[in-house]
Amino acid sequence: MERISTFNDFINEGRSKWDSFASKLTSAVFKTWIKGYENGMTEINYSDQIESKLEFDLNATIFIDKQYKGFEVIDGTGADGRDDDDEGDFQTPFINIYFGINPEWLPGEWSEVYFHLADVMRHEMEHITQDGIDHGNYRAGKPIEDDSQMRALIKLGLLPQAQYMMLPKEVDANLQGLRYEAKKRREAMIDAVNRYLDTQEQGGVIDGTEREEI
């Protein structure tokens, strides 16, 4: 009889296999950003072709500008783990990370930038393992069903944004990202989850009823 994976199996798999890898990448990006900031740069990019354990291109940029009220995760942040693009052409899976921060928040809020970077890095790495069979990235048991139609309907506003958070691929990625952030902050995972849901509710993305459902 095939053994059914439990929630603890899922969490422990992420902890044992990918946390050290996520830590290495997070540290490399963060050190590049810090060095660029100290050298007076206002747009600091880190890019790399990852070929160890997983295969994907990593692009991570932070913009330091007064147009941002505080700290923001900018649109365009995300991952595409597919072997083929929308036109059916072969592509290398990729992770793009774009952060923006007001210069008045630095250097005091670098620790918050780091914690958010850890969350996003681990979140997007989880997406890489949900696809990319030809690249050897897909890991058995991960949700791989095509959810592009649901995502499109949500983006068009035809379905509530809360549905996005309940897509199987997003549930797994959110849990691993928030778990990893909590580990870095040395806090309980529930604290990281509640803080994330607080920001979504306060931003009007979800309401109280949807929060309970999530």
Language model: regions and residue ranges:
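Short acidic, low-complexity intrinsically disordered linear motifs used
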Residues: 1-14
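Short, intrinsically disordered, charge-balanced linker/junction segments flanking boundaries
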Residues: 10, 85-87, 210-214
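Auxiliary, metal-adjacent structural segments of Zn-dependent hydrolase domains
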Residues: 17-95
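Long, well-structured alpha-helical subdomains associated
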Residues: 31-37, 149-214
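Active-site scaffold of zinc-dependent metalloenzymes
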Residues: 72-115, 128-132
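Hydrophobic (often cysteine-bearing) scaffold residues that line and stabilize catalytic clefts
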Residues: 114, 118, 169
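Post-HEXXH active-site segment of zinc metalloproteases
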Residues: 115, 131-165
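Active-site recognition of the HExxH zinc-binding catalytic motif
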Residues: 119-132, 173
